Amino acid sequence: MQELDLIIVGAGPVGLYAAFYAGMRGLSVAIIESAQVPGGQPQNLYPEKLIYDIAGLPAVTGADLTKNLLEQLAQISHRLFLGESVQKIEKEEGIFSVTTDKSTRRAKGVLLTTGAGLLKPRKLGIDSEETLANKGKISYFITSLKEFEGKNVAVFGGGDSALDWSLMLEKVAKNVHLVHRRTAFRGHEITVDRVMNSNIQVHTPYTFSNLIENELELKKIKSEESLNFSIDKILVNYGFLTNQVTLAENLEVSRNGRVKADSMMQSNIEGLYVAGDASDYPGKMPLMSVGFGEAVHAINAMTKKLEFDHPLRGGHSSSIF
């Protein structure tokens, strides 16, 4: 069985960039991803949504970000295994065995970039929700904005996703109604300002009451007041429930189910590192840009701590390519 320098579990944005950086440092690397398509949430949940907080990219869609990361990754030697679910990670005599539902691979180091785990959307909580979702009346994320062209759309939620999608839907939908059960939104101030100064109809503090055919009824919180308007589609942005899977015995996790990391992004198991939304430490910020830095930090740390059978590369990227 071939022994690699590094196995990365998770092919989201942080995992893809981590693989590129590891290859740039001269590590032999493989990435294992349970989904059939790489790219994580940006690719699979919101490929057309614009992302604004990545350095050097004024705005990029989830699909284009994934495309760019894969093009970057293609510059180095690597192996990408899709559709394989990691079952367990074991360490014996300083070497990790990563077992999936299809095979077992060995490596000196492991980097977990599994994100928030398996995601299930939080739902409205109404009796007919599954039927309405199957009919396409209710959605939890958008894979194609064309589905909403010329439609009357109601967006439920008060965070960044609800705000961002409302702004994007405004460009294609006939009308956009943003419904939040509180008076204040939880998103970035600049995004809230953009929504308030747009043509989006904001309804706060309201919650879902009833839907008959295309007639949506909202109920005002702590009031008998109600509001009715015609609607074609509903987008629910109440966030996601996560199902983090502990892959290694004795791996320390925080209360929120994420892997505890030290200042070098190493877990309590020597040689097993973590980066991105899967990690937790004091002051942790769940941002993609932070995850990229965590991946670099973890790989640089393991190159100093672990023993490799070949010399590693250093220096700036401009001197390597």
Question: Each PLM stretch: what is its role?
Answer:
Residues 163-165, 278-321:
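A conserved FAD-binding loop/helix module that cradles the flavin
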Residues 4-30, 165-170:
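N-terminal Rossmann-like FAD-binding beta1-loop-alpha1 element of flavoenzymes
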Residues 1-9, 37, 80-151, 220-224, ...:
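FAD-binding core/adjacent interface of flavoenzyme oxidoreductases
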Residues 73-100, 104-107, 170-261, 310-318:
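A Rossmann-like FAD-binding core segment of flavoenzymes
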Residues 36, 149-172:
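Rossmann-like NAD(P)H-binding beta-loop-alpha module
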Residues 23-44, 176-187:
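Glycine-rich FAD pyrophosphate-binding loop
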Residues 127-149, 233, 237-289, 297-301:
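FAD-site-proximal beta/loop scaffold in flavoenzymes
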Residues 36-60, 188-192, 196:
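Conserved N-terminal glycine-rich FAD pyrophosphate-binding loop of Rossmann-like flavoproteins
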